[in-house]
Amino acid sequence: MKLKFTKMHGAGNDFVVLDGYTQPVNLTPAQVRALADRHFGVGADQLLLVEKPTVAGVDFRYRIFNCDGGEVEHCGNGARCFVKFVRDSGLTDQRSVRVQVQKGTITLTMQENGEVLVDMGTPVFDPERVPFATKGLQGRGEGADTLWPLDVNGTTRWISVVSMGNPHAVQVVDDVEAFPVLVEGPVIERHARFPQRVNAGFMQIVGRSEIKLRVYERGAGETLACGTGACAAVAAGIRRGLLDAPVLVHTHGGKLTITWDAAQADQPLLMAGPAATVFEGEIELPDSLADSLANSQAA
């Protein structure tokens, strides 16, 4: 199988983008893993697929696959790359497009300064809808938020649980660079209280409108930036009374700006940040390569 692809990144969160709008693209999880493999494939945190929508009133369908081959609900950094890709590829000349994601629709707008503004939707804090199992736990209130105790390697971490269309667990730490993200991240990601696993966010408060953030992403590990993770962290910080919008989010890959008016019911978060094309190419992806990679990773 020969595939044309575009390699892109949003604040260092990198993607293989495929045009499934003008050609059929049907990949197995093993083939997704092969494309995302940094040694034998193109290499990426996620694979993004552009398709024709299956619902009325939208321009495109936006699908996201993690580097482990699993399909996920949302990716904010990928959304910015998505709108740049469809414009650069000539699939649309609109500055603003409405796209179908796994849970609903979002609006993406290319701004005059080259950054992309993404309507990320309204954050959800109901544990059942994240989902997060609270049975037997006693939460504690902080501002308008509820923090939940989570046993992580024998230590209790107090977390906010948020859905941005995908699940997030956010905790505040004193020094995000010194914190053992690579130790605690995978434990939180697969914690039994998150039945669909979770993205683990570690937020350091720099000021009332500025944070540093690291995210250990579900199915991808720590990435240089996570758009939904930035939104979840800012939403949790505002609800806890720690932050005021707009908030500048520093990630290892770059800066994002998140705006949210928590006082208004059902108000969406808005995320602004960069999107860049790295290169375009074509790759031969025989079934044997995908199978060999799948076997080597399972060994």
UniProtKB/Swiss-Prot annotation:
Pfam families: DAP_epimerase. It catalyses: (2S,6S)-2,6-diaminopimelate = meso-2,6-diaminopimelate. The active site is at C75 (proton donor), C226 (proton acceptor). Its EC number is 5.1.1.7. Substrate binds at N13, Q46, N66, G76, N77, N166, N199, E217, R218, G227, T228. One of its GO terms (biological process) is lysine biosynthetic process via diaminopimelate. GO terms for cellular component: cytosol. InterPro entries: DAP_epimerase_AS, DAP_epimerase_DapF. It is an enzyme of class 5 (isomerase). One of its GO terms (molecular function) is diaminopimelate epimerase activity. It comes from the Bacteria. Keywords: Amino-acid biosynthesis, Cytoplasm, Isomerase, Lysine biosynthesis. Pathway: Amino-acid biosynthesis; L-lysine biosynthesis via DAP pathway; DL-2,6-diaminopimelate from LL-2,6-diaminopimelate: step 1/1. Catalyzes the stereoinversion of LL-2,6-diaminopimelate (L,L-DAP) to meso-diaminopimelate (meso-DAP), a precursor of L-lysine and an essential component of the bacterial peptidoglycan. PANTHER family: DIAMINOPIMELATE EPIMERASE, DIAMINOPIMELATE EPIMERASE, CHLOROPLASTIC. HAMAP family: DAP_epimerase. This is Diaminopimelate epimerase. It comes from Paraburkholderia phytofirmans (strain DSM 17436 / LMG 22146 / PsJN) (Burkholderia phytofirmans).
